[in-house]
């Protein structure tokens, strides 16, 4: 059976839903198969002007950087059309920004070029591209207000991973762009997995905040809970709903089939740690397990979000419990298991043939 996806589930709840995906797709299956009525096809980073060589780190200028504004125009047209047809809709926009190449409007770049750096890792090109993205998203929010549908629309903003740790990317460095968080994209440290997460919509108190950890795979159960709490998918769903947190001023818990957030990097990556590793976060504790020698690190994120002080030997029971939960989960889902020679290059999973 095909897997659960947000658009497919929404159509099961209400067949009138119209679903669309614009921007970066980056997986091999056709968007239509996963439930999208309208889409840009199997687009990847190259459709966002990405070139995988040294030029990706050089600042460039464009009036439509990374297709930000053309994606916004397409999104606004879609929203307006569905509103005229009185159709409920689900729209996902996966921006090419702020992935390299580093492209922004020249005017925006000059604004940040002339600002004094507060950290050595500050980058005017990334800052400018991020502001251009913010402007593009603002166009869509303005359209929602113009159509008077904000009281019936949930908007979710997040990212898939933290920033590259350095520009250009390299393995060794003192502080990453994500400083004071440790490391960045490609690694399961906080700089790689802790990302912005903003939700607005009916019932959510303006400017409220929450310290409850959530993760991308919580989105599907949360959306189900918002649209029709009585609906139960036929297949198991990994995450849990954070609806109560949204509607309770950031307070509450997320109930998942297993206890903790799990991240798995089953390969070596020469421009990252170059060590296969996994991590689990439960309450305020985070355990990282390295797969080459089974080394364990434990951090209290409430006291040490920078992941500088390993407290595993001071807390052997907590370390053992988290390690057992982590390994049991990977076994239960038959996850890819690192073995010597598995790196981050695209290799057919049947060739790797190494699983828990």
Task: Please name every model-derived segment.
Residues 1-291, 295-296, 305-331, 338-356:
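Formylglycine-dependent sulfatase
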